[in-house]
Amino acid sequence: MLNNAMSVVILAAGKGTRMYSDLPKVLHTLAGKAMVQHVIDAANELGAAHVHLVYGHGGDLLKQALKDDNLNWVLQAEQLGTGHAMQQAAPFFADDEDILMLYGDVPLISVETLQRLRDAKPQGGIGLLTVKLDDPTGYGRITRENGKVTGIVEHKDATDEQRQIQEINTGILIANGADMKRWLAKLTNNNAQGEYYITDIIALAYQEGREIVAVHPQRLSEVEGVNNRLQLSRLERVYQSEQAEKLLLAGVMLRDPARFDLRGTLAHGRDIEIDTNVIIEGNVTLGHRVKIGTGCVIKNSVIGDDCEISPYTIVEDANLAAACTIGPFARLRPGAELLEGAHVGNFVEMKKARLGKGSKAGHLTYLGDAEIGDNVNIGAGTITCNYDGANKFKTIIGDDVFVGSDTQLVAPVTVGKGATIAAGTTVTRNVGENALAISRVPQTQKEGWRRPVKKK
């Protein structure tokens, strides 16, 4: 159906006392992203014209964390209930738009469920998201007459009979802006909590003869809120289980779905194998037939076809062409690039460095601010000395170079194509093509040498 223009209000003013944290509750992360950011992203994907964020506790931290989002910041100086929070945002509502109310601590609400709620909202009425629980203790109950929603009664205000009702309010609703403002103006705090309940607008709408349509979410986890770290950890596992299931059904082999974390987005080819305790962060792309060993962390990187990443390797903001092998215990930092067939072995670190086709850095090496050609061998213990204490400098190594073990290349320096660097050499000047560079001191040998002994 054709929807009206819509704006979203996200309530995020709570202190989150039970989190026992100096960080505002809604900034605690789920799948590597602040809870409230999940909700903002859903609102934007839904096509919200404006997103009004009602805040109170930790406003400066919220504004810093969400500075890249186009938000209208609405201060709720005193936390006097959900109705009071909406009253603070009401001056920004247009009469001819729909207003969708969401919560910053309900992070798993889906765009699909919200779209169904939006579609179900009757003209002049309210769309209400509800669920049925076996144990509804503590939640507002949905009251009905002849099947029609008549109101919401908070648990503390409910009679014994009303507390037997299993259908409860999730707090998520949508209504017309003009209607919302009129109903908000009529709210009172005549209840056990002494607060202004947004739920009271349901009874006000019913009294006006307006229709209230209840919609259920696809999954209960979509409407579960977070008040403490235990609840947050449980939602994290729910989310990760759902993501793992999607990947398995799409052909990705997760050796143990319960020990895999996706904290971003994963684009992938066919025949991917991912071992246990792997973490994917940010935006990651895996080509066909990629294998990732246990304990790896891959963040904001592109991994080409037929690459193999051995256990306990960290890859961040890096690009690997086809058929590269890295690890175990390797670290690719931002700006690392491996061309086709390159190899980075154990205890090798790369940063802002390119390793050419078929080139190898087998072990115990640091390559920073370096450009390394094709078919280069980097011996164990090689270090590009790129920093003089104030500035960074570049090392350039041409094709077909052999770098012996325990070599230091003091940048800025260039090693020409086909050159050989002898083991133990400190390179401080450019090396010409096909030349041998060696800077070791001559070896001396003392016959019959006796080791020192400890004094008694």
Curated annotation (Swiss-Prot):
It catalyses: alpha-D-glucosamine 1-phosphate + acetyl-CoA = N-acetyl-alpha-D-glucosamine 1-phosphate + CoA + H(+); N-acetyl-alpha-D-glucosamine 1-phosphate + UTP + H(+) = UDP-N-acetyl-alpha-D-glucosamine + diphosphate. Residues 1-229 are annotated as: Pyrophosphorylase. Binds 1 Mg(2+) ion per subunit. Its cofactor is Mg(2+). Pathway: Nucleotide-sugar biosynthesis; UDP-N-acetyl-alpha-D-glucosamine biosynthesis; N-acetyl-alpha-D-glucosamine 1-phosphate from alpha-D-glucosamine 6-phosphate (route II): step 2/2; Nucleotide-sugar biosynthesis; UDP-N-acetyl-alpha-D-glucosamine biosynthesis; UDP-N-acetyl-alpha-D-glucosamine from N-acetyl-alpha-D-glucosamine 1-phosphate: step 1/1; Bacterial outer membrane biogenesis; LPS lipid A biosynthesis. One of its GO terms (biological process) is regulation of cell shape. The active site is at 363 (proton acceptor). GO terms for cellular component: cytoplasm; membrane. InterPro entries: Bifunctional_GlmU, GlmU-like, GlmU_C_LbH, Hexapep, Hexapep_transf_CS, MobA-like_NTP_Trfase, Nucleotide-diphossugar_trans, Trimer_LpxA-like_sf. Residues 251-456 are annotated as: N-acetyltransferase. Gene3D superfamilies: Hexapeptide repeat proteins, Spore Coat Polysaccharide Biosynthesis Protein SpsA, Chain A. It is an enzyme of class 2 (transferase). Catalyzes the last two sequential reactions in the de novo biosynthetic pathway for UDP-N-acetylglucosamine (UDP-GlcNAc). The C-terminal domain catalyzes the transfer of acetyl group from acetyl coenzyme A to glucosamine-1-phosphate (GlcN-1-P) to produce N-acetylglucosamine-1-phosphate (GlcNAc-1-P), which is converted into UDP-GlcNAc by the transfer of uridine 5-monophosphate (from uridine 5-triphosphate), a reaction catalyzed by the N-terminal domain. This is Bifunctional protein GlmU.
